[in-house]
């Protein structure tokens, strides 16, 4: 989860998020190099008192500053396209979770099991435990197994919402009348927090998401208790 004064990205909990962080660092390095080069050229031109009166055009330099940016853009575009295709790929999911956005809470359904569905509301500040997180904790968490391919289907019942968990690198828009899907793979146990990332009304900022990642045997016990209850 995001911590106080954290200016960087959250710690990744999925392979896709790790790849997104690598791409961020790759693109940032290229941007820093361009900024330093342009700043150096502007500094030299500003303090240079010499002018070449016989320089009317420079074909070589024009070719360089046309071809070089194209090559740089290729170095950014290729890993970006690879990640876009990876984000859309569905790899034989073990579990399917359906998320429905409402004003202003989430509903969840475990499509592979009967009668496993619940609503998830934010816990108000006056009911929050001493060790709870303000505006982030919910009354019913999503419980998912680690080291398993998980598919999530996202839609909305009223207005556009967006189901987002930064640590997993997941952001899916929930649109009324449409069913969007993506997949993710949680590689460690823990609690992962997210929020609705599409302005959806007065209580938009009170729609948190909490995923509890557990080992597979604990998940099976939880599902068994949920089906029997």
Swiss-Prot record:
Q: Which residues bind Cu cation A1?
A: 161, 196, 200, 207
- Which cofactors? Cu cation
Q: Which CDD domains match?
A: CcO_II_C
SUPFAM superfamilies cross-referenced by the UniProt entry: Cupredoxins, Cytochrome c oxidase subunit II-like, transmembrane region
Mitochondrial matrix-side stretches of the chain, per the record, are 49-62
- Protein topology in the membrane: Multi-pass membrane protein
Give residues annotated as binding Mg(2+): 198
What's its catalytic activity?
A: 4 Fe(II)-[cytochrome c] + O2 + 8 H(+)(in) = 4 Fe(III)-[cytochrome c] + 2 H2O + 4 H(+)(out)
Record keywords, A-Z: Copper, Electron transport, Magnesium, Membrane, Metal-binding, Mitochondrion, Mitochondrion inner membrane, Respiratory chain, Translocase, Transmembrane, Transmembrane helix, Transport
Q: Write down the Pfam families for this protein, in alphabetical order.
A: COX2, COX2_TM
Positions binding Cu cation A2 in this chain are: 196, 198, 200, 204
Return the broad EC class.
translocase
Q: What does this protein do?
A: Component of the cytochrome c oxidase, the last enzyme in the mitochondrial electron transport chain which drives oxidative phosphorylation. The respiratory chain contains 3 multisubunit complexes succinate dehydrogenase (complex II, CII), ubiquinol-cytochrome c oxidoreductase (cytochrome b-c1 complex, complex III, CIII) and cytochrome c oxidase (complex IV, CIV), that cooperate to transfer electrons derived from NADH and succinate to molecular oxygen, creating an electrochemical gradient over the inner membrane that drives transmembrane transport and the ATP synthase.
As for family, the record states: Belongs to the cytochrome c oxidase subunit 2 family.
Q: Relate the assembly described in the record.
A: Component of the cytochrome c oxidase (complex IV, CIV), a multisubunit enzyme composed of a catalytic core of 3 subunits and several supernumerary subunits. The complex exists as a monomer or a dimer and forms supercomplexes (SCs) in the inner mitochondrial membrane with ubiquinol-cytochrome c oxidoreductase (cytochrome b-c1 complex, complex III, CIII).
Q: What is this protein called?
A: Cytochrome c oxidase subunit 2
